[in-house]
């Protein structure tokens, strides 16, 4: 679709700090021409230096000596190394596109979701989002520390940001919580900040 070679980097429920760590590694080791980045609004609600998952940083540095505890860990020796060795010489070209897929673990559709949900006809007062879309302080900090440094330091890299589609129930829950207008304003403000850069789509 976009040409070139891509690597899919996923962090389950990752914060923007988790994604920053992946970008740091990618840019420090490769010539990155294009970044496709799915922005989850919830990921921007974490403190900008807070990982949602602790990264074993010792595995990502250049010091081989501090990897000893990993390599000689009983679980790694007994389980993971044999699994890796069994795949030597094998090729599964589809695996790159299907890794981290978990959609088959769940049932989808209105018949699966709606029976457990009660809808209300009451009008919910929404939090005041202001007239002009403006990033909240938390969003600002995440964008300034975890997005913009890479966009600004790599003007030849094309950054393509997108919002993964949320279900209608997610938006209804935002309405029920009184944050629907605020969430939509945050999205709009984020779009305006990012699109100010020539290397962003």
Model features per residue range: what roles?
Residues 1-71:
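Membrane-embedded segments
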Residues 8-13, 130-137, 174-179:
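Second-shell loop/turn segments in exported
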């Amino acid at each position: 679709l976009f040409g070139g070679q891509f690597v899919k980097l996923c962090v389950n429920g990752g914060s923007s700090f988790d994604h920053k760590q992946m970008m740091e590694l990618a840019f420090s080791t490769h010539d990155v021409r294009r970044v496709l980045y799915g922005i989850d609004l919830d990921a921007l609600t974490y403190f900008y230096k807070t990982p949602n998952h602790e990264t074993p940083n010792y595995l990502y540095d250049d010091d081989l000596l501090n990897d000893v505890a990993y390599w000689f860990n009983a679980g790694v020796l007994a389980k993971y190394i044999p699994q890796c060795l069994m795949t030597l010489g094998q090729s599964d070209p589809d695996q790159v596109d299907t890794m981290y897929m978990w959609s088959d673990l769940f049932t989808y559709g209105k018949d699966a979701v709606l029976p457990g949900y009660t809808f209300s006809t009451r009008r919910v007062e929404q939090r005041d989002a202001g007239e002009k879309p403006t990033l909240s302080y938390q969003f600002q900090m995440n964008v300034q520390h975890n997005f913009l440094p890479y966009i600004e330091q790599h003007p030849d890299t094309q950054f393509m940001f997108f919002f993964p589609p949320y279900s209608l129930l997610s938006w209804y829950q935002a309405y029920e919580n009184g944050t629907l207008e605020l969430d939509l304003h945050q999205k709009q403000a984020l779009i305006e900040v990012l699109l100010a850069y020539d290397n962003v789509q």
